[in-house]
Amino acid sequence: GDLFTITTSRQVHQSKAVIIAMGGGAFKPRALDIEGAEDFDNVHYHVSNIQQYEGQQVTVLGGGDSAVDWALAFEKIAPTTIVHRRDNFRALEHSVEELKQSSVSIKTPFVPSRLIGENGHATHLEITKVKSDETELIPIDHLFVNYGFKSSIGNLKEWGVELQRHKIKV
C-alpha cells in the first residue's frame, strides 16, 4: 500500500501509519486582555521563587484553584489582593473558606481594566466593578494572572495535516 513520508531535520522516514500523540496540544497561559499588559515586567503568569516577593504588594487575578492557592501562599509573606469577576470562586470550598478567613483583600465582582506605570513597570492596577462604572486603584509591585490555559494545535496546521473542527480528520 501507500507509505507516508515524514521528513525531520535529521532524516526521512517512511511508514504505513502515522500516530500523532499530542493530547490537547501545547498549552500556554491565557493572557491578560489589557492594552499594553505585555509591556510591563511585573505582570507574571507563573511563580518560580515565591520568596523573591516577600514584603511586596502582590495582586492575583482569577477565581479558580490556582488563583486562590497562590493568594493564600503569597499572604504568608506579602500584602495580597485577589481580584475575581464573580462573587463566587470556582476553587475548592475548603480553600475558599481559608481565603475568606485570611488577610487577603478580596475584590469581587471586579475585572482589571487598566495598568498604570512607567518605564516598563506597573505601579497600579485599575479594577472596574462588573455591571458598573465604579473603579478602584490598587497599588501593585507584582501582578499574577491565573486565568487558566489555552491549547494550541499550531504545528499540525504547519505540517499540512487536514483538520476538521480543530481535530485531525481521519
Please give the residue ranges for each predicted region.
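Rossmann-like dinucleotide/flavin-binding elements
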Residues: Y45-L92, S132-L137, G148-E158
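C-terminal catalytic lobe of FAD-dependent flavoproteins
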Residues: G120-V170
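A conserved short coil-to-beta-strand element within the FAD-binding core of flavoproteins
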Residues: G1-F4, T108-A122
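N-terminal Rossmann-like dinucleotide/flavin-binding domain of flavoprotein oxidoreductases
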Residues: G1-V12, F89-T108
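FAD-binding core/adjacent interface of flavoenzyme oxidoreductases
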Residues: G1-Q56, K131-T135, F144, I168-V170
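Conserved beta-strand segments of alpha/beta enzyme cores
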Residues: N42, P79, S105-I106
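Short, glycine/charged-enriched secondary-structure capping and boundary segments
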Residues: L32-A37, A73-K76, S95-L99, A122, ...
